[in-house]
Design a protein with these regions (language model features):
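Active-site beta-strand->loop->alpha-helix modules in alpha/beta enzyme cores, enriched
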Residues: 1-135, 190-194
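The feature marks non-catalytic terminal segments
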Residues: 1-2, 64-68, 98, 102, ...
């Protein structure tokens, strides 16, 4: 199965675990799509207990669970220290060997300002080509963000995702890594009425047929 008919999808996160928290179930489900994860910094301002190599290793441990996932971690402390044009240049230079038909970013309607900064990269990366642009839900996505695409997860896919999230060992004490919070993140009332108990949520911003 493919993710929205995509052959190769670029998934951009501001921090380690952003993409995986929002999309790891889709990685497990949509094995016919190749996903490239790009992490734009090593983590947040308040985490002084881990290094770039620590967080990079956590990401790599997750990516190794999926035959269709690879990734790059930008060796930068923060997103906020990177001008937008530098981030675009980094992406277009370091990932020039790929052709992405789909780009997925953090939402604009998000309480984390670095997520909003990463969201701005999407339209710039789609400026020349008919790429599909999508936002994935994060733990800090605001309530008035409205998804328009759901990926239902089978129990197997969901268990794979939870196992993947456990590999972010440095983050296990964060409230949003609590199992009840993770379960709540994947519930949608309207989807549950239709028999889909666990879903990942997306907002398609702009879509083109492939």
């Amino acid at each position: 199965m493919k993710f929205l008919n995509s052959i190769t999808t670029l998934c951009i996160g501001a921090h380690p675990d952003d993409v995986e928290y929002g999309m790891a179930g889709t990685f497990s489900k949509c094995r016919d799509t190749d996903f490239v994860v790009l992490v734009m910094s090593e983590g947040g301002d308040w985490d002084k207990t881990t290094t770039y190599n620590d967080r990079k290793k956590e990401n790599e441990n997750v990516w190794s669970m999926f035959s269709n996932v690879s990734g790059v971690v930008n060796n930068q402390d923060f997103v906020k220290d990177q001008p937008e044009d530098d981030m675009i240049n980094f992406i277009e230079t370091n990932l020039s060997d790929y052709y992405f038909d789909t780009i997925v970013t953090t939402p604009q309607e998000d309480s984390h300002f670095e997520h909003r900064m990463v969201n701005h990269l999407g339209p710039a990366l789609c400026r020349r080509d008919s790429k599909t642009l999508i936002e994935y839900r994060t733990p800090s996505t605001l309530n008035h963000w409205i998804p328009n695409h759901f990926e239902p997860l089978e129990p197997y896919n969901y268990e794979v995702k939870k196992a993947a999230l456990r590999k972010f060992t440095s983050q296990q004490k964060a409230p949003y890594f609590n199992e009840k919070c993770i379960d709540s993140f994947h519930h949608n009332f309207l989807c549950s009425k239709k028999g889909f108990n666990m879903v990942e949520s997306y907002r398609i911003v702009e879509s083109y047929s492939i």
